[in-house]
């Protein structure tokens, strides 16, 4: 489903992106993410598709506002029934919807007696009562505690897949991006990048996108010039003035100060087979810390006055004997450098 909307009310906004499965629209506070949801739901004047020109009650959308907006004085089933037509089938239909989200056993409880995840699923059942074609979620993880956030969100996304219902969730939390089927990034009140989580997280389109995604390896360098038709040279002054080579960026000029980034997964340790190791951008650093995360280690290298984060396989870390204080030369490559 394509979202194509222009908004002049409250904030000026023009966006165009795809919703596939569970899609996260990521952006900082104030970008207009909630405004977009309200416009798609018909609660704000806007131009666009889908549902353009329809009254709110005519739009096949389910809307989960931030905090879920459950009525505290109504039982769980009564909150769901609030979205259903009056009649003798109202309660059975509400209980059926609660059963779909595996909550029929708490139907008689009031919202304050429910966990954050249970409240979210009651709100989901209420949204499903409208038989929506699209589900809209505003900051779905904001009311969840850190200890249960991943589990609750993973269960919610699994339910979306079971229902075959496309969902658009807006958030400023980059952690959610990894759980989604698709990610769209908003900056400057426009979509600046979209794709699968693997595509967007591994290669942000700009340092600004990298910051939104929570990347740590963000640095400043000075442009030296262009070495040839395919290479641009940068001087990383804070890391002892080493020279970096990246794919040619013709718009950069000598002397210009630029931001650049590299994903921790793009930083390469020397291969187990030295004859296969041909570094493009060798950088030497000293191990400040390392954290064993099971399949890989998160390693912090001190490079001059900068800290470079590396995600390295356990085999490579053990092979090179990386311990706090040891020195290692890694390769930044050139394809992974984003400027």
Question: Over which residues does each language-model region extend?
Answer:
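ABC ATPase "signature
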Residues: 194-195, 203
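A short, proline-enriched helix->beta-strand linker immediately N-terminal to the Walker B motif
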Residues: 129-133
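Conserved ABC ATPase "signature" region
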Residues: 91-106, 157-158
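Glycine/charge-rich catalytic "coupling/switch" loops of P-loop NTPases
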Residues: 240-290, 315-339
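Catalytic Walker B motif of ABC-type/P-loop ATPase nucleotide-binding domains
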Residues: 135-139
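Conserved ABC ATPase signature
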Residues: 110-114, 118
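Conserved ABC ATPase "signature" C-loop
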Residues: 189-190
């Amino acid at each position: 489903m394509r979202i194509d909307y222009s908004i002049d009310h409250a904030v000026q906004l023009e966006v165009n992106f795809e919703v596939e499965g569970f899609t996260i629209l990521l952006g900082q506070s104030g970008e207009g993410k909630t405004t977009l949801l309200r416009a798609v739901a018909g609660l704000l004047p806007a131009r666009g598709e889908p549902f353009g020109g329809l009254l709110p009650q005519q739009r096949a959308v389910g809307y989960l506002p931030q905090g879920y907006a459950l009525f505290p004085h109504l039982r769980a089933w009564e909150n769901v029934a609030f979205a259903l037509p009056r009649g003798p089938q109202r309660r059975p239909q509400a209980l059926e919807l609660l059963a779909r989200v595996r909550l029929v056993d708490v139907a008689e409880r009031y919202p304050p007696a429910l966990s954050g995840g249970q409240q979210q699923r009651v709100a989901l059942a209420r949204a499903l009562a409208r038989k929506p074609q699209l589900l809209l979620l505003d900051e779905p993880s904001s009311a969840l505690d850190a200890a249960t956030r991943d589990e609750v969100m993973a269960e919610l996304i699994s339910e979306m897949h079971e229902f075959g219902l496309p969902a658009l969730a807006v958030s400023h939390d980059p952690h959610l991006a990894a759980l989604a089927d698709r990610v769209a990034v908003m900056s400057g009140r426009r979509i600046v990048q979209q794709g699968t989580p693997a595509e967007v997280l591994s290669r942000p389109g700009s340092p600004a996108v990298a910051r939104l995604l929570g990347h740590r390896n963000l640095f400043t360098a000075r442009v030296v010039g262009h070495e040839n038709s395919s290479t641009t040279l940068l001087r990383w002054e804070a890391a002892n003035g080493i020279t970096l080579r990246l794919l040619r960026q013709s718009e950069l000029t000598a002397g210009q100060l630029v931001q650049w980034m590299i994903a921790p997964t793009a930083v390469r340790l020397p291969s187990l087979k030295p004859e296969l190791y041909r570094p493009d951008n060798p950088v030497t650093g000293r191990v400040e810390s390392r954290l064993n995360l099971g399949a890989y280690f998160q390693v912090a290298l001190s490079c001059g006055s900068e800290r470079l984060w590396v995600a390295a396989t356990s085999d490579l870390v053990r092979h090179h004997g990386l311990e706090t204080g040891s020195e290692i030369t890694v390769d930044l490559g050139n394809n992974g450098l984003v400027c």
